[in-house]
Amino acid sequence: MRIAPISAVLGSLVAAGVAAGVVLQAAAPVPRPAKEFTLTLPSGKQAQLASYRGKVVMVAFMFTTCPHCQALSKVITKLQNELGTRGFQAVGVAFNDEVNTPNAAGNAQVTAKFISDNGVGFPVGYAARPAVMNYLSLSDVERWVVPQVVIIDRKGVIRAQSAATGTADLQTESYLRKYLGDLLSEGAAPAKSGTPSKAPAKKAADKKTS
């Protein structure tokens, strides 16, 4: 996984792949209603997560330069092909520095290259890092890794989210296939905020840097 910076100093360490993730703040509660989120597709068109309401949605927040994100995108493509007809929709959001430049055409090009290089079979766009952190309820005072995964049920409720330091199950094909299949089988049954969910235990992913 890729360790995300909490300061300029840590940012340089991250680039060298030597920073280690340590949670300093509790993760956002799950389940909870999903906030609206907008991403920009390589075409320049903006897409909103709300447009997928009624489907089970998996959102992968990634760095285009992160090998773990690249590997996960291949897993998600397989799941999209298998489960799409049942109402599953995957979405990718790139938010590293390479897609957050003043050059919109350059941002789109980097995102499109990520899609092409990894054979991605689901929509991937880009967004500003502050917007992503706000959506994930991550803080500048904690260290976090990518990819970060959020799974939203048909009613627009977040049912699973990666821990700041990563959740291995949410990057594992066999686990995701079963978990998503269970959510798809629920139909439109909502999850009540504040009640226990069937989300994976917060088992941290192996602390490998890229």
Stretch-by-stretch model annotation:
Residues 71-119, 129-134:
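Structural microenvironment flanking redox-active thiols in thiol-disulfide oxidoreductases
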Residues 146-210:
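Thiol-/selenol-based redox modules, centered on thioredoxin-like
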Residues 58-59, 90, 149:
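Hydrophobic beta-strand anchors of alpha/beta hydrolase catalytic cores
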